[in-house]
Regions:
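Mid-domain catalytic core of redox enzymes
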Residues: 1-56
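Short, histidine-centered active-site or binding-site loop motifs used for metal coordination
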Residues: 69-71, 163-164
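A glycine-rich dinucleotide-binding beta-alpha-beta segment and adjacent secondary-structure elements
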Residues: 38-46, 97, 101-165
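Flavin-binding catalytic cores
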Residues: 19-22, 30-39, 58, 81-122
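Solvent-exposed residues in well-ordered beta-strands and their adjoining turns
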Residues: 1-2, 68-70
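Amphipathic alpha-helix from the class-I
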Residues: 70-78
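C-terminal structured subdomain/cap of oxidoreductase catalytic cores
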Residues: 1-6, 60, 83-91, 128-192
Length: 192
């Protein structure tokens, strides 16, 4: 397992955010605004095999790294194998800065750009949140104004997932909220 500088070894058993302070995050976002990924990106690192070792061969682990602020369209042109390789290198270099020796532990890397995510699973512009997490698209405005109560545009149609409140990154909550609305409607005799 990687050893993150300044953190106890047990930190690898949870989520480790690499993002520093607000200035670090703002610089990462600025790169995104101008059509590039950040050379020092904001990262969410999770090693699920610390909780469920059956997900990898004995003695091995895998790490999932969510990179914030990666543009769908690059200012320099479309994503290519070369740009993807440089992006991957920048992410690995950033982790290495915070967990010295990390790159020596890596046996395989699989990188997904926003373009890959859109083409593989159909999420528009690779946005795993199914919409921006901005004030005009949060709370009762999620997924859009008038559809914020988990009910769809016709009877017996309910919505859940990242595109509904509270949005992406809150696992299970949108589904639980939609189920509560469905149960309320069922008790009132609305659901058939």
């Amino acid at each position: 397992l990687p050893q993150f500088a300044g953190l106890p070894k047990e930190a690898a058993y949870g989520t480790v955010d690499i993002g520093g302070d607000f200035d670090y995050i703002e610089r990462a976002f600025d790169d995104f605004k101008y059509g590039s990924w950040s050379k020092r990106p904001f990262l969410d690192c999770v090693i699920p095999t610390t909780v469920d070792p059956t997900m990898a061969p004995p003695g091995k682990h895998f790490m999932s790294v969510f990179v914030q602020y990666v543009p769908y369209k690059l200012a320099e042109g479309p994503w290519s194998q070369e740009t993807k390789a440089q992006y991957t290198k920048d992410v690995l270099d950033t982790i290495e800065m915070h967990a010295p020796g990390f790159k020596n532990l890596v046996l395989h890397v699989q990188t997904r750009t926003p373009w890959d995510i859109e083409n593989e699973v159909g999420m528009t512009e690779g946005n795993i949140f199914h919409g921006e997490l901005t004030l005009d698209q949060l709370l009762f405005n999620r997924p859009f104004p008038g559809m914020g109560q988990y009910r769809g545009p016709f009877d017996n149609f309910y919505m859940c997932g990242s595109g509904t409140h509270p949005g992406g990154g809150v696992m299970g909550a949108p589904g639980a909220n939609a189920a509560h609305e469905m149960l309320k409607d069922f008790k009132r005799g609305v659901v058939q």
